[in-house]
Amino acid sequence: MFTMKKSLLLIFFLGTISLSLCQEERNADDDDGEMTEEEKRGIMDTLKNLAKTAGKGALQSLVKMASCKLSGQC
């Protein structure tokens, strides 16, 4: 009887450990997906900010050139 309880306890313990390892792996897989989405979002934001900055710089140079041509001080 004692041996049977001992072996059942051992099986329960090993089963619990294997289940927790499976859950950790599943959670790790889920985290990778979230990180990928964040990286994609970060890249898109960076590209958008780069385009805004380039657009502002080009617009400012066009405005300077137009004001110079209109005033005749070029």
From Swiss-Prot:
Q: Which Pfam families match?
A: Antimicrobial_2, FSAP_sig_propep
Keyword annotations: Amphibian defense peptide, Antibiotic, Antimicrobial, Cleavage on pair of basic residues, Cytolysis, Disulfide bond, Hemolysis, Secreted, Signal
Where is the secretion signal located? Answer: 1-22
Q: Which cysteines are joined by disulfide bonds?
A: C68-C74
The compartments listed are: Secreted
**What residues make up the propeptide removed on maturation?**
23-41
Q: Which family does the similarity line name?
A: Belongs to the frog skin active peptide (FSAP) family. Brevinin subfamily.
Q: What job does the chain carry out?
A: Shows antibacterial activity against representative Gram-negative and Gram-positive bacterial species, and hemolytic activity.
Recorded protein name is Brevinin-2Ef
